[in-house]
Amino acid sequence: MRIFIFNPEHDMALASGLVNFTPPRAGRLLRHDLCFLPAIWAEKEDAVLVDDVDYAWEQYMITTLNKPCNFINYNELSRMASLGNDMEFEPWGWDMPVREQLVKCNVPMSSLPDNDYLNNIKKISHRGWCAKNLLPTLTKIHNTIGNAKIGHNMEELKIYLSAYHSI
């Protein structure tokens, strides 16, 4: 069974590097209000992990999508994990807080990404890495343009400004 998790605060959690990350209020509200979103692409045998199953159903019904879906809360996930159910997790994005939530629900660490995997996600999510590794390839595509410079301090910024006169 695939279990989807909507965690729009993922980028902030990833950048924080904290296991116990509390996102800003806006991120928490977005996660709460749109918790049902993965149900749109989930298959009928999949589940969406939410804080409040009743609220998720109410919001999902507003979409008028006429397809079956399963919402589960953390207690249900803990029960399923304790029974040894085969589960594959698909969060919006993997980060340490998501992994920690799943561990607290008795999901075995062996079925979750390790620190090396999470650190690699953090590395390739950085704008600097993307500017260096993705942009050169993307700008080779017909009708695309782009330029990026990475500045690590004010001195590098001043050098760039003196050469280009704008950002």
Predicted ranges, named:
Residues 1-50:
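N-terminal-proximal low-complexity accessory segments that begin disordered
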Residues 27-41, 49-167:
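Conserved N-proximal alpha/beta basic substrate-recognition cap immediately N-terminal to
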